[in-house]
Amino acid sequence: MVNIPKTRKTYCPGKNCRKHTVHRVTQYKKGPDSKLAQGKRRYDRKQSGFGGQTKPVFHKKAKVTKKVVLRLECVSCKYKNQLVLKRCKHFELGGEKKTKGAAIQF
């Protein structure tokens, strides 16, 4: 279980800052695919008409987890930066901190 706080003081490479400032942390999420991308247009053109599936459908999935990407937004200048973490199965943003000697609860 990886638990990351919602704010983090780190270096801001923005033009106005260039110093350590507080950043707001969120998890990166992939946006919707563009329907105008060249590959998508080519694929749709090839799929149209008779003939069924024209390109191979990928089945040999190798990875169990994805790498966690953090999106850091500077509080003072709104500069957005991304930070990649290692692979983990359970990721939590702003969860409760563990205390020493406390019983583990699931």
UniProtKB/Swiss-Prot annotation:
Any one GO MF annotation of this record: structural constituent of ribosome
Assembly and interaction partners: Component of the large ribosomal subunit (LSU). Mature yeast ribosomes consist of a small (40S) and a large (60S) subunit. The 40S small subunit contains 1 molecule of ribosomal RNA (18S rRNA) and at least 33 different proteins. The large 60S subunit contains 3 rRNA molecules (25S, 5.8S and 5S rRNA) and at least 46 different proteins.
Keyword Ribonucleoprotein: yes
Protein origin, superkingdom: Eukaryota
Modified positions (N6-methyllysine) in chain numbering: K55
Organism: Schizosaccharomyces pombe (strain 972 / ATCC 24843)
Keyword vocabulary terms for this entry: Cytoplasm, Methylation, Ribonucleoprotein, Ribosomal protein
Entry-linked Gene3D superfamilies: 3.10.450.80
Protein role: Component of the ribosome, a large ribonucleoprotein complex responsible for the synthesis of proteins in the cell. The small ribosomal subunit (SSU) binds messenger RNAs (mRNAs) and translates the encoded message by selecting cognate aminoacyl-transfer RNA (tRNA) molecules. The large subunit (LSU) contains the ribosomal catalytic site termed the peptidyl transferase center (PTC), which catalyzes the formation of peptide bonds, thereby polymerizing the amino acids delivered by tRNAs into a polypeptide chain.
Assigned GO CC terms: cytosol; cytosolic large ribosomal subunit
Gene from which the chain derives: rpl42
Subcellular location: Cytoplasm
Main localization of the protein described in the UniProt heading: cytoplasm
Name of the protein in its database record: Large ribosomal subunit protein eL42
InterPro entries: Ribosomal_eL44, Ribosomal_LSU_eL42, Ribosomal_zn-bd
GO annotation, biological process: cytoplasmic translation
